[in-house]
A protein has these predicted regions:
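Class I S-adenosyl-L-methionine
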Residues: 1-156
Length: 156
């Protein structure tokens, strides 16, 4: 898989360069795999190290990927706050930004941290941070969430 991924990223990089752009890749669409740990077969490098001029980014619920870990310079991780990892948020915000889902309108600040509109784009590596809340408006089934995943305005 990693060899195929490297081939595809190489193609993307060439297409982006032909248009005068820098390639950006989000590795985890629905998973939370620590790609920084996986070496591409036949190399001693992970995928980010193999493509130092490509920007990689992901969301993760795993706080241990930030704390005392050295991530590749071209890999930006945004913490995904949920009801079961909320207690880790303050510590994580010292290292990165955090995505938080809100019911209704986004607040200007939350728990003393500035909130920016994360629904405008997904290029989290362009955000100011650490210590910034990436506010997302609850959509679909999340609008009816009662688990604590979605922050209600009374809590904001």
């Amino acid at each position: 898989f990693l060899m195929d991924l490297a081939t595809e990223i190489g193609r993307l990089k060439r297409r982006a360069a032909a248009k005068g752009l820098k390639a950006a890749v989000r590795l985890n669409g629905t998973s939370d795999l620590p790609y920084e740990r996986y070496k591409v077969p036949g190399t001693d490098k992970n995928i980010m190290e193999l493509f130092p001029d490509v920007q990689f980014y992901d969301y993760t619920k795993l706080d241990n990927r930030f704390i005392n870990k050295k991530l590749p310079a071209n890999y930006h991780l945004t913490f995904s706050r949920a009801e079961d990892n909320d207690h880790k948020l303050k510590k994580v915000l010292k290292h990165t930004s955090a995505a938080v889902v809100f019911a209704g309108k986004l607040p200007k600040t939350w728990r003393g941290y500035p909130v920016i509109n994360g629904d405008e784009h997904d290029a989290r590596f362009t955000d100011a941070g650490p210590g910034v809340i990436i506010g997302l408006i609850a959509k679909g089934k999340a609008r009816h969430d009662k688990s604590g995943f979605v922050i209600n305005q009374k809590e904001a």
